[in-house]
């Protein structure tokens, strides 16, 4: 009887502390977000052809409540069992240079989604949208809505060399 109670307690602790996570990694960008009817959040990731050789610096976990710098985007989300959302803020030094704000406060609610645009000239991607920040707002009915900051990234004359911090993480690395 005691072992059954322990197993039930362990199961309750596991379920109560569960989280849902979704991430793009350091080679992809978040171009969309979906809020399911049950409140679960997913981000949609892509690697546009004009961004194939570009890298962002992302932390190991989503622990931030906001991605507040103009050189960061949301590289992942963790949704806790209480509904709270944590963000993985990836830093990309060239973001302020090559992007403009497309939408400052685009709101999506339960059952809705946002999917960014890709601008094309023939077969070449010239610009794409990405999520720079997600602000979680608790509505009066207890559900959450999300305000998105959307950047339009203009591929233009982007340098093909990875940033210096990325090169230092590659093995072997020697100072010149």
Curated annotation (Swiss-Prot):
InterPro entries assigned: Dev_Signal_Hedgehog-like
GO biological process, one term: cell communication
Subcellular location: Secreted
Keyword Secreted: yes
Tissue: Expressed in seam cells, excretory cell, reproductive system, pharynx, pharyngeal-intestinal valve cells, neurons and neuronal support cells.
DNA repair listed as a keyword: no
Phenotypic effect of disruption: Worms either die at embryonic or larval stages (43%), or exhibit variable abnormal morphology.
GO MF, one example: signaling receptor binding
Gene Ontology cellular component list: extracellular region
Signal sequence, start to end: 1-21
Keywords: Developmental protein, Glycoprotein, Secreted, Signal
Glycosites: 70
Function per UniProt: Intercellular signal essential for a variety of patterning events during development.
PANTHER family: PROTEIN QUA-1-RELATED
Protein name: Warthog protein 5
Origin species: Caenorhabditis elegans
